[in-house]
A protein has these predicted regions:
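Beta-sheet entry/capping signal
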Residues: 10-12, 37-40, 82-83, 91-94, ...
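Short, glycine/charge-rich beta-strand/loop segments that flank catalytic centers
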Residues: 40-45, 78-87, 120-122
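GST-like fold's C-terminal all-alpha helical module
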Residues: 76-80, 94-98, 104-111, 115-222
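Local sequence-structure signature of Cys/Sec-based thiol-disulfide redox active-site neighborhoods
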Residues: 2-50
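Structural micro-motif
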Residues: 53, 57-87
Length: 222
């Protein structure tokens, strides 16, 4: 329910370089040219501690966990990225820590840039749900499956969803998943597929088919 038009406080977006869910928020940030309204701060993953850390202390905090504790006195939040927030009366005001919601919030901001922005349009919610559950989450379900049955189910759903996208692209007249207009479907799918060969194929065992077998998806990804 946050109204960006009525609130003039500087909005901040915390993201991690390696996080695909952060990547989708950064895509909207760039496409909408929101650098005047939203300040992006990148955090690094500390392998030793398993935490996200600031390159320089931010508001007295070195880690994301410390920042969450400082800003969620009345609410319980998991220390995850991305994170959209501002300050009210010098207090941290968390707007959202859910990437899909952040994408929608940022897309609602009117850019102050003089340059032309690219609009992100809505798409079929069932398609978006398929991308989110079976592809974005699906690669992790494959990689972290606790048994063979769970892995096979996740892999089957993953490649079934990719086949659905492949067929949809084959019927399209435009360059995007839903035709001639960029939609949330493109924003959601790209961060996963751009990481496919480097991460998901081998490390997460997403090997039922090669991504190169999906000719239309490869063309779309370019």
């Amino acid at each position: 329910n946050y109204d960006f038009k009525r609130n003039t406080e500087k909005t901040y977006l915390l993201v991690g370089n390696s996080c695909p869910w952060c990547h989708r928020t950064l895509l909207v940030y760039k496409l909408k040219k929101l650098s005047r309204q939203v300040k992006v701060i990148f955090l690094e993953a500390d392998i030793n501690s398993g935490q996200w850390v600031f390159n320089e202390k931010f508001k007295g905090c070195k880690t994301l966990n410390q920042f969450y504790k400082k800003g969620s006195q009345n609410n319980v939040f998991r220390s995850t990225l991305p994170l959209l927030f501002n300050f009210q009366n010098d207090q941290i005001n968390i707007l959202s820590s859910e990437s899909s919601q952040i994408v929608g919030l940022m897309d609602s901001i009117k850019s102050e840039s003089s340059q032309k922005t690219l609009e992100v349009n809505n798409c079929d919610q069932d398609l978006l749900k398929t991308i989110q559950i079976d592809i974005n989450d699906g690669v992790y379900k494959c990689g972290f499956a606790r048994n063979q049955s769970s892995y096979e189910k996740a892999s089957k759903n993953l490649f079934k969803a990719l086949s659905k996208i492949e067929k949809k692209l084959d019927k399209n007249l435009g360059n995007w998943i839903c035709g001639e207009e960029l939609t949330y479907a493109d924003i959601y799918l790209f961060p996963t597929l751009i990481r496919w060969e480097l991460i998901y194929r081998n490390l997460f065992k997403c090997t039922e088919k090669e991504i190169s077998d999906f000719k239309n998806i490869i063309k779309w990804r370019l």
